Design a protein with these regions (language model features):
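Non-heme di-metal
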Residues: 1-319
Length: 319
């Protein structure tokens, strides 16, 4: 059997500077959930109503499912169509961080929740029709043979579908609840923002190589797919937030992020400003520069840097 030749990646010869830029961003952003003291949220968790606790577990289980899809199928499906070996490296990093994100929700569960309640939430995720449907819609394009449609699906997952879930911890954070959990979610959001931007950038680079007719067909496909996902997401939101007064606010957040997903692909917004008007408190909570509550020496937050050790001498202690 003849083996194909393998070329070693050379980071000193880069054909697309964006690959190195994003690699550096992702690696400098690296974090692990163990660095965030989620146990500090136990008192706040106990003040939530049963409905709020159950909703939080369902939201995080749904997000875990999407992260699992992106880790196991999504990012790996983009590898065969990478334009450069450096793009392959970035996609591998993206895949790994999606696994970290999925692991993070389990850290939240093990810290705040009862096992039986978490097990019930996982069982719910297997049976919830809108949740399974959005995963199936995305997955069918990942398993298809059109590399540009894969990228469209990936951007919609990274930049749109997560946000019906992300809304809830940002809402709690804006009211001073589960603030350490919100710190962790902000780290995830920061990663997803880079992922959606980068994959959208690669989509636009590939679009330069095809005909105008093909570009128009793909744009039509993208808007049709977004509307299909949006309709399903409305149903998911109505079911998820049924026992709260928050569904309309979540839907505005969906429109806001759907427009951002389209911008990542190089397209104009779909939803008018009045449909995408998000509560300023939620936008403030989303900021990656929001104040973290955990130890800044951990280096895992987004608004501080890793502490540096300096050797001391005996005279330093002569006060």
């Amino acid at each position: 059997m003849k083996l194909s030749r393998i070329s070693a990646i050379n980071w000193n010869k880069i054909s697309d500077d964006k690959d190195l830029e994003v690699w550096n961003r992702l690696t400098s952003n690296f974090w692990l959930p163990e660095k965030v003291p989620l146990s500090n949220d136990i008192p706040a968790w106990q003040t939530l109503s049963v409905v709020e606790q159950q909703l939080t577990m369902l939201v995080f289980t749904g997000l875990t499912l999407l992260d699992t899809l992106q880790n196991v199928i999504g990012a790996p499906s983009l590898l065969p169509d990478a334009l450069t070996p450096h793009e392959e490296a970035v996609l591998s990093n993206i895949s790994f961080m999606e696994a970290v994100h999925a692991r993070s929700y389990s850290s939240i569960f093990s810290t705040l929740c009862q096992t039986k309640d978490v097990d019930a939430a996982y069982a719910w995720s297997e049976e919830n029709a809108p949740l399974q449907r959005k995963a199936q819609i995305i997955q069918q394009h990942y398993r298809g043979d059109d590399p540009l449609k894969k990228k469209i699906a990936s951007v919609f997952l990274e930049s749109f579908l997560f946000y019906s879930g992300f809304w809830l911890p940002m809402y709690f954070s804006s009211r001073g609840k589960l603030t350490n959990t919100a710190d962790l979610i902000r780290l995830i959001i920061r990663d997803e923002a880079v992922h959606g931007y980068y994959i959208g950038y690669k989509y636009q680079k590939n679009m330069e190589k095809i005909s105008q007719a093909q570009r128009e067909e793909l744009k039509s496909f993208a808007f049709d797919l977004l509307l299909e996902l949006y309709d399903n997401e409305l149903q998911y939101t109505d079911e998820l937030y049924a026992e709260t007064p928050w569904a309309d606010d979540v839907k505005a957040f969906l429109c806001y992020n759907a427009n951002k997903a389209l911008m990542n692909l190089g397209y104009e917004p779909l939803f008018p400003a009045e449909m995408a008007e998000v509560n300023p408190a939620i936008l403030a909570a989303l900021s990656p520069n929001a104040d973290e509550n955990h130890d800044f020496f951990s280096g895992s937050g987004s608004s501080y840097v890793m502490g540096k050790a300096v050797e001391t001498e005996d005279e330093d202690w002569n006060f």
